[in-house]
Amino acid sequence: MDLTLVLSLLFLSCFHGVSSDSRYFTSLFTLGDSYIDVGNFVIMAARAVPAVPVWHDKLPYGMTFFGHPTGRLSDGRVIVDFIAEQFGLPLLQASLLNSSDVSKGANFAVGGATAIDVDFYERNNLVQFKLLNNSLSVQLGWLEELKPSFCNATKGCRGCFSKALFFVGEFGVNDYNFLWSAGKTEEEVMSYVPKIVEHIVRPWRGLSTKVQYMWLCQGIHQTGARQPF
């Protein structure tokens, strides 16, 4: 089992028995890639010009829990659904649905999301196709845009995130995928590691000193033994 999934489950076990009126978390915000995307990729792909092919908008995706496709790259739920259920929160909708009710949080994750902005890969000819603009910085921008609506829904900005849990899914795996697919050697890929890590870490440095809330950050899984590599 993926170590990051194990750690996430251990985190949930610490709050076993917490009721829906818990003092712990009253909202959940998630950023990440396909592991926790609940429909943003499908929405972005449909809006893209030309449209981006989508394969997970039909069965068997969604069949084991929802009974129909939901935009999740899973036949059922994803890890953030279980986290929401643990705290008595509703399953988050994709943020790009622009729901009028954001009082319980939002899911900003998009399949294929990168740590480094996508124009870096396009500008340096590291990909042969147009990428969706879904990087970590873009998702953080969406979060910033949503903040006034969330704070209004929770009666004021001062401390409005104090009972929010932020789940940051894996970032970086798609960056490495693009580099390997571009024919980069192991040494060349390794040379990009500091840049990728810096893009993942940098946004949180300022936030952690300005706002009080809890972050749960997921690392990337080992890729060396996976079939594409």
Q: What does each model-identified segment do?
A:
Residues 2-229:
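Conserved active-site regions of diverse hydrolases
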